[in-house]
From Swiss-Prot:
CDD domains: ANTH_N_AP180. It comes from Mus musculus (Mouse). It comes from the Eukaryota. One of its GO terms (molecular function) is clathrin binding. Disruption phenotype: PICALM-deficient mice suffer from severe anemia due to ineffective erythropoiesis in the bone marrow. In addition, they exhibit impaired clathrin-mediated internalization of transferrin leading to iron metabolism abnormalities. Keywords: Acetylation, Cell membrane, Coated pit, Cytoplasmic vesicle, Developmental protein, Endocytosis, Golgi apparatus, Isopeptide bond, Membrane, Nucleus, Phosphoprotein, Ubl conjugation. This is Phosphatidylinositol-binding clathrin assembly protein.
Length: 660
């Protein structure tokens, strides 16, 4: 038989379906393959015994179930697996086996399938008997003799007389069961029995070491014992001498099958004079006549016997010391490898973090090192040159925050880098800042009053500061109009001259689009006169003047002719401002714009110009007819369509409108 049988595969598949990994591993460890259980399966089962959530009785029952198989291979491998777990597994496993009344009932096992089955069945019966005795020994003394502490302060050397006389016979029974295996080197012909013999060999070495230490302790206390205790002790010692001979034969078989000679201990026989001294002492206690012997001679004989047995014990423990040393070296090698791996990981982590942290610093290091120190609390400097940052990020050889605008004038003289933000001339500084945002201009009066006359003109001025370059106090705060509101309402109403001056240094939001044509700087531009029938012209101011005139607000009077009753039919006689009467479709709801309340009015039906005025930029309402416009929040998107400015001279909110 070689390899796993079909029955083994079916059984393993059944356990896979049921989800029992332990039973599946037991099945794989005890297949029909003529070889010892595989190490990977044994290691897995050992680990299972160390897990608290593994059912130890279920594991043991699985092994017991495999011993009921008719094949000697399966039964033998089941016993080997059980023995391996008893020696190397968790102590819970052997505790459970010791608590059972019966373990392996294989005293009548016989495999009649072949000649090899007959031969192996004999060793199976002997092997099962030893495992049963091993479990019984654990039940009696509550510890495993192969795992007890050995040496001068070991368990067997420090045991008292009463307990010692009860414990040593238990060791003798277990040793007898082990030596009853009685295998020859010629019978170790397959891997299964070889695996069992190796486990028995290790148990024999450890068990005899404990046995030897118990005998040493017994001899040291023999001459102080009572008569009954001396009689029991003498009988134990005689059995010990007999078993030493059998143990020597067992070790010879181990040497013949190829076990290293260094792993086999040397057994030193005690002198024969010791047995005579023990018998004479017992006879003296019983009152028999013995030959004269001094206490000094007895002590000398006893010391010689103890030293010889102690040397035997040292030779027996030599294997364990080598195993211990090998285990320690292996653990040290693993620990060293783990330390090296950990040091490599720690060496990589700081390097990565430092590189990551240093990247932005190294990128901007040049700018940080070359940037001049700026004192924001310094007083304005009287230097005649403008401060310029030497670090040009884009190599454009210009100030870093220099605004890119058309016709930008130079910065004024006498200005520091940032100026004094806490100076007393904040108002003048605010007026001197270029108006880049139409909603950030300073209010010069009451917002509810009519628009001042000086708002209509664009004063000719040169900006005293550029954006983020510096703030210098201006001696005179000149009121100016917003750069975004380029509509001249006063000139349309006829209250002021139409001469305007274009600010060449201001910010051009629309790039010169929809602005009045300028002949030259500081040169007034008269408003072109258009025929009455042409509402829209190429000039923005003229177009607005015509549109406002058509709305009927050019005369500056307020229409208060509100009627609460149904008006009668009126005949229109015409006039310069006559328009066809068209019923209003809807009225705009009163809205608040910049804190100012304007009354309602209904826009008449008229032709809108192709381009919307740029005056009310930010109130983005598309021109639509027959619907109520929605008032939105002011924005800075200059490309949005704009709303016409409301009529500040319209009727009061809520009043009915009647057009003449």
């Amino acid at each position: 038989m070689s390899g796993q049988s079909l029955t083994d595969r079916i059984t393993a598949a059944q356990h896979s379906v049921t989800g029992s990994a332990v039973s599946k591993t037991v099945c794989k460890a005890t297949t029909h393959e003529i070889m010892g259980p595989k190490k990977k399966h044994l290691d897995y089962l050992i680990q299972c015994t160390n897990e608290m959530n593994v059912n130890i009785p279920q594991l043991a029952d699985s092994l017991f179930e495999r011993t009921t198989n008719s094949s000697w291979v399966v039964v033998f491998k089941s016993l080997i697996t059980t023995h391996h777990l008893m020696v190397y597994g968790n102590e819970r496993f052997i505790q459970y086996l010791a608590s059972r009344n019966t373990l392996f009932n294989l005293s009548n096992f016989l495999d009649k399938s072949g000649l090899q089955g007959y031969d192996m069945s004999t060793f199976i019966r002997r092997y099962s008997r030893y495992l049963n005795e091993k479990a019984v020994s654990y039940r009696q003394v509550a510890f495993d003799f192969t795992k007890v502490k050995r040496g001068a302060d070991g368990v067997m050397r420090t045991m008292n007389t009463e307990k010692l006389l009860k414990t040593v016979p238990i060791i003798q029974n277990q040793m007898d069961a082990l030596l009853d295996f009685n295998v020859n080197s010629n019978e170790l012909t397959n891997g299964v029995i070889n695996a069992a013999f190796m486990l028995l060999f290790k148990d024999a070495i450890r068990l005899f070491a404990a046995y030897n230490e118990g005998i040493i302790n017994l001899l040291e206390k023999y001459f102080d014992m009572k008569k009954n205790q001396c009689k029991e002790g003498l009988d134990i010692y005689k059995k010990f001498l007999t078993r030493m001979t059998r143990i020597s034969e067992f070790l010879k078989v181990a040497e013949q099958v190829g076990i290293d000679r260094g792993d086999i201990p040397d057994l030193s026989q005690a002198p024969s004079s010791l047995l005579d001294a023990l018998e004479q002492h017992l006879a003296s206690l019983e009152g028999k006549k013995i030959k004269d012997s001094t206490a000094a001679s007895r002590a000398t004989t006893l010391s010689n016997a103890v030293s010889s047995l102690a040397s035997t014990g040292l030779s027996l423990t030599k294997v364990d010391e080598r195993e211990k040393q090998a285990a320690l070296e292996e653990e040290q090698a693993r620990l060293k490898a783990l330390k090296e791996q950990r040091l490599k990981e720690l060496a990589k982590k700081p390097h990565t973090s430092l590189t990551t942290a240093a990247s932005p610093v190294s990128t901007s290091a040049g700018g940080i090192m070359t940037a001049p120190a700026i004192d924001i609390f310094s007083t304005p400097s009287s230097s005649n040159s403008t401060s310029k940052l030497p670090n040009d990020l884009l190599d454009l050889q210009q100030p870093t925050f220099h605004p890119s605008v058309h016709a930008m004038s130079a910065a004024p003289q006498g200005a520091s880098t940032w100026g004094d933000p806490f100076s007393a001339t904040l108002d003048a500084v605010e007026d001197a800042i270029p108006s880049l945002n139409p909603f950030l201009t300073k209010s010069s009066g009451d917002v509810h009053l009519p628009i001042a006359s000086d708002v209509s003109t664009f004063t000719t001025r040169t900006p005293t500061h550029e954006m983020f370059v510096g703030f210098s106090p201006s001696p005179v705060a000149q009121p100016h109009s917003s750069a975004g509101l380029n509509v001249d309402f006063e000139s349309v109403f006829g209250n002021k001259s139409t001469n305007v001056a274009v600010d060449s240094g201001g910010f051009d939001e629309l790039g010169g689009l929809l602005k009045p044509t300028v002949a030259s700087q500081n040169q007034s531009l008269p408003v072109a006169k258009l025929p009455p029938n042409k509402l829209v012209s190429d000039d923005l101011d003229s177009s607005l003047a015509n549109l406002v005139g058509n709305l009927g607000i050019g005369n500056g009077t307020t229409k208060n002719d509100v009627s609460w009753s149904q008006p009668g039919e009126k005949k229109l006689t015409g006039g310069s401002n006559w328009q066809p009467k068209v019923a209003p479709t809807t009225a705009w709801s009163a809205a608040t714009m910049n804190g100012m309340h304007f009354p309602q009015y209904a826009p008449p039906v008229m032709a809108y110009p192709a381009t919307t005025p740029t005056g009310m930029i930010g109130y983005g309402i598309p021109p639509q007819m027959g619907s109520v416009p929605v008032m939105t929040q002011p924005t800075l998107i200059y490309s949005q369509p704009v709303m016409r400015p409301p009529n500040p001279f319209g009727p009061v909110s809520g009043a009915q409108i009647q057009f003449m």
